[in-house]
Amino acid sequence: MNLYNLSDTIVFKILRDIDFGYLEIINFDGAILKFGNPNDSLKANIKIKKQNFTFNLIKGGSISFAESYMKDEFETDNLSNLIEITARNIKIIHKFSGLLDLQ
């Protein structure tokens, strides 16, 4: 298992615990992952375009997330909803966000 696969495993396992909203992720390898309640009115999606996306989240947290968006390493149909889902599930997100930030 390489580092990127390991980071995918960590992030996606933690995302299973989100309480608010519904998040659909199309991973770099084409796998479709679904988290949260599909009946929730708050929905967002992420299409990951670079294999190192989840590793960067673990390494650099929200700064890396913003940088990845600016570098077009992922895309979403609704950035506002994605940010709201992240904010409403911040206790879950913080379990992996910036986990490897050594600064």
Predicted segments — roles?
Residues 1-103:
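Feature captures hydrophobic
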